Amino acid sequence: MYGNLANKLILDAKRSSNLSETPLYQTDLVKSIIKETTDLNKDAEYLGEEQRIQEEDSENADEEKMKINQCQLFVTHLCMRRNKRCLLAYEKLRADKIDEFSWLNIDPITETGNTDPNKNKFGSTGNGSNSLVSNSANYTTQLNLDNLNHAEQEYYKNYQHLITNYKSNFADIDLSGDLDPPTNIFTDVRVLKNGGEVQTEYGVFNLIKDSQFYVRKSDVERLIQQGYLEEI
């Protein structure tokens, strides 16, 4: 049935909207929707030609048949428009997640495995600046480049370049910092997954799952972004 494939794509987008990582691009499903839309367009062209012929020969035309033809043409156009809207919504959601991740200055995952939790995109340690967001659970904190199609990889690369150029005009301002000042300098955190050793100004601690620490928030902000820690 027309529209079922687009519905599957939207359901996939809905499931991934609250994930902290960008899932695999649905290449086969997108291609199938495009093919379906192309077939619908051919049907619309045929129905449009039929309607034109009937209107030119209105004296001998069957009025009931004309109404059926108009209804078929209308429904066909609706299906095409819905497919287009679903495709655009899916692409926009993924583009928004790429944009969101780009501002966090975190290394994307280029292959299976974890990145170093103590390093951000520019190789600095975990005591970096305040983050764009304070609760990583609702934001994109992981980006596996293998899950992006070629166009998305190019988009990510160009968007990163755009951000870098923009930030260079405001060297004294942390544009990726949180707009709201922290309520407390120190905070309690819980480790969500195992990691390496973290060096801070006040000492060293190891990322061992389910362990808890009382640390300066600015020292672990990047780890919270990456999903290694959560505030409690």
From Swiss-Prot:
Please list the GO biological process terms of this entry.
Answer: DNA strand elongation involved in mitotic DNA replication; double-strand break repair via break-induced replication; mitotic DNA replication initiation
Keyword Nucleus assigned: yes
Q: Which SUPFAM superfamilies match?
A: GINS helical bundle-like (SSF158573)
One GO cellular component term noted in the UniProt record for this chain:
nuclear replication fork
Entries under Pfam families matching the protein: PSF1_C, Sld5
Q: Where, subcellularly, is it found? A: Nucleus
Keywords in alphabetical order: DNA replication, Nucleus
InterPro entries, A to Z: GINS_A, GINS_bundle-like_dom_sf, GINS_Psf1, PSF1_C
Q: What does this protein do?
A: The GINS complex plays an essential role in the initiation of DNA replication.
Per the record, the similarity remark reads: Belongs to the GINS1/PSF1 family.
Subunit arrangement?
A: Component of the GINS complex which is a heterotetramer of SLD5, PSF1, PSF2 and PSF3.
| Designated name of the protein | DNA replication complex GINS protein PSF1
Gene name on record? PSF1
